[in-house]
């Protein structure tokens, strides 16, 4: 069973909104004042968007492949896929870019499908290292290519707006599978294509 599609049906919209009111009171606010009357509803609706990935199975996006280009066997790279996620430790935003590459083995998908896989995993509570591995594993398991490379750059609000308060800092993680891990030339070609760090991510 794909647990990513499960929702907690026992929690109602009203209960979720009341939880927001509780947090507002805890912060020292009055949720009944005019400016905050609609805030609980808006927050719950925003959460429905931010965490819509739990209602999807990313593997589904990679099921349809292009038969007419199944003979293509050179590297395919999609770079600078922007994403927004949330840190599972502080529920703070993570904003950045994902770069994906693979060496097809008879299965080629539309490039938008790779971006949808990224979105599906990003729209959940995440740790960047875990998300990197999840995207790579999804592509490897579904398309069975000769190799997969995933590199993620992310600026973490839990570091820039609290705690150490360091702006302009970005985190880079990578996951290499198959030929991307075993062949230094393949890995170098991929990294040259994506040019990590050429654009500063600020949060």
UniProtKB/Swiss-Prot annotation:
Gene name for this UniProt entry: folE
Assigned keywords, A-Z: GTP-binding, Hydrolase, Metal-binding, Nucleotide-binding, One-carbon metabolism, Zinc
PROSITE patterns, alphabetized: GTP_CYCLOHYDROL_1_1 (PS00859), GTP_CYCLOHYDROL_1_2 (PS00860)
Pathway annotation: Cofactor biosynthesis; 7,8-dihydroneopterin triphosphate biosynthesis; 7,8-dihydroneopterin triphosphate from GTP: step 1/1
Catalytically driven reaction(s): GTP + H2O = 7,8-dihydroneopterin 3'-triphosphate + formate + H(+)
Family statement: Belongs to the GTP cyclohydrolase I family.
Top-level enzyme category: hydrolase
GO biological process terms on file: one-carbon metabolic process; tetrahydrobiopterin biosynthetic process; tetrahydrofolate biosynthetic process
Gene3D superfamilies with a match to the protein in the record: 1.10.286.10, 3.30.1130.10
Binding positions (Zn(2+)): 87, 90, 158
Name of the protein in its database record: GTP cyclohydrolase 1
EC number: 3.5.4.16
Subunit structure: Toroid-shaped homodecamer, composed of two pentamers of five dimers.
GO terms assigned for molecular function: GTP binding; GTP cyclohydrolase I activity; zinc ion binding
Membrane-spanning intervals of the chain: none
Keyword field contains Oxidoreductase: no
A GO cellular-component term linked to this record: cytoplasm
PANTHER family assigned: GTP CYCLOHYDROLASE 1 (PTHR11109:SF7), GTP CYCLOHYDROLASE I (PTHR11109)
Organism: Xylella fastidiosa (strain Temecula1 / ATCC 700964)
Pfam families listed in its UniProt record: GTP_cyclohydroI
